Amino acid sequence: MAFSVAVSPFRTPMRTNYWMIAFMVAFLLVWANSYIGTTDMANWFLENTLVFFFLGFLIITYRKYQFSDLSYLLICVYLCMHVYGAKYTYAENPLGYWLQDQLHWSRNHYDRMVHFSFGFLLAYPMREFFLKWLKYPRWVAWMLPIEITMSVSALYELVEWAVADVFFKAQGDAYLGTQGDIWDAQKDIFLAFIGAIIATTIVSTIKRLGHIYSPEEIAAMNLKS
């Protein structure tokens, strides 16, 4: 079972896409564990609202828009990090506390890790979507993931504020996870931005070195040889 790092021109039914199935099973196990053992059910539902919509989008559009196995892996890792954070609330995450003790941090930085991962892990799938499915020029497909990461991060912070402050005041502090930092939202957006820049830089560098080829590029090289 080959592991693809670029979008294939051939459609693979979901029932025979074994990597996709493996990622789905892994995520569902983490998701179920986060639900069963959550310390704050109201916060869990708040944190997972967008997850429901995002998973629905991936499933509904699968026949038309299929990502590479690498993209599905990156998406799976990010979603697992997010729902693991929702299990305890970001501010009270055990892994964050452990890292805080080991690295002598002044706060629980698990929320910052997830925001950084939003840009770092999802920039590549976004690039695939713009380059392969929307057929945007390469330079646009490089820039848009960075711009969208910043825009979505800023929008998410506004949604967080609205939901926490207007609708669920009791869960507000836990949901926002600011831990007393008045610049928490700005730092979260910045970390997502940096993550996207690092990811696109790594992929661009690897492609320049010739280590990642799309199926079309491989076919073209075979024809020339």
Language-model features: locations:
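Primarily interfacial, aromatic-capped hydrophobic alpha-helices that serve as membrane anchors
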Residues: 182-225
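Short, hydrophobic transmembrane alpha-helix segments
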Residues: 33-45, 56-66
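Interfacial helix-loop-helix junctions of multi-pass membrane proteins
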Residues: 40-44, 95-96, 110, 153, ...
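Membrane-interface loop-to-helix entry segments
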Residues: 43-50, 106-126, 182-197
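Membrane-interfacial alpha-helical segments at the cytosolic side of multi-pass membrane proteins
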Residues: 53-62, 117-133, 165-171, 190-206
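Internal alpha-helical transmembrane segments of multi-pass membrane proteins
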Residues: 134-150
